[in-house]
Amino acid sequence: MNPYAELTHFAGFDWAKDHHDVIIVDVQGKIITGFRMDHTVEGWRTWREKTAAYPRLGVAIETSFGAAVEQLLESAVSVYPVNPASAKRYRERKCASGNKTDRHDAWALADALRLDGQAWRALQPQDPIVAELRILCRDEVALIEERTALVNQLQQALHEYYPAAEEAFDDWTQRSAWAFVERFPTAEALTRAGKRQWEKFLHTHKLNRPETFTRRMEIFARAGEWKVSAPMVAAKSFYAVAKCRQLRLLENELHAYRRRIEALFASHPDSSTFGSLPGAGPKLAPRLLGEIGSDRTLYEDAGGLQCMAGTAPVSYQSGQIHRVSLRHRCNKMLRQTIHHLARLSRAQCTWAANYYDALRERGKTDAQALRSLGQRWLKIIWKMWQTRTCYDPELHLKNQLAHGSWVLSFQPSTPPKKHAKNFSKKATCNG
């Protein structure tokens, strides 16, 4: 039985950072009560007291996560998340003039749940491991973005006063690059140290590969040719060293995040399913589990998962007008993860590489080809997820042959193009 059918009262919850507006209506749409509550312990005590008389209460709210949603789920009510774009339409339906108040917004949500909620899906209590994994992975990505910002700031400073240092290292996310700036913060310090100290530094940090060692030594030798004013050097070198120290601290925290994520992921029964995906590796597999979750009833078919990931296009048809466009309203984290998976899978799956290459030859852009490949992977992932099985390249090929998959038409007679510069070298599967 649909839990919605058991509801006797419907609440609209217009949430904000420090307070929330609530309207409760009955099955006829009559407003039973309305109140504003603070987002505090006392405020949530007020919520429980005022809603205790409505044991079968459904709540509509414009978000599916956050502190307010956690508190609502703890109070044992049915929570129905509403897309903000849909909520805006419901508000406009209730007030064509455009008049807007928080109380009106809460009422519009409550009445929308009363009238249309039979087609909505209530939030289910989350698997604790999945919930923590999702938050950790999203925060890890945020920290990586912070690291990228710090690296850009460091490189810009070096470009202004110390271009030799910027030129000497290609990857500024490496500790050896930061150590160089800390050891030789200025071109003058580098020149004064001399050749023997340069060689010692490179050997200590295992930067003595023949193809790069000679080039770096040449760069160090001409570092003093770039002339900059003394005040600029003094200020920017102080700034650059500060950025290196920030990067070092942040890198330590990223390593701690990685250990926690990998431990949580390994403890979940679905880890083998997502971990078996070609190209997923220790970073993408936990993100996939965190975003897709473990509730098998959430997506009735692969199409629902594809829409959530943003790989399924949006079609608009009216009269003789028909256009197809990119889906913007989706789970951005899941879309980014699938994009990376599609890119990395080409190095390990022949069919994925052939499929991508064929789409590029047909004129598709890199992003379009990867999105199409991600669409194919999501169909596979959904089936693996539903059946709790690992990716089997031989079974996949057998299914392609049995069903006459059109992907097989992309298989060339010659080996696929290699993309070694983008991927680590791993065994190729023939899926």
Residue ranges with predicted function:
Residues 1-431:
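A detector of single, family-specific signature residues
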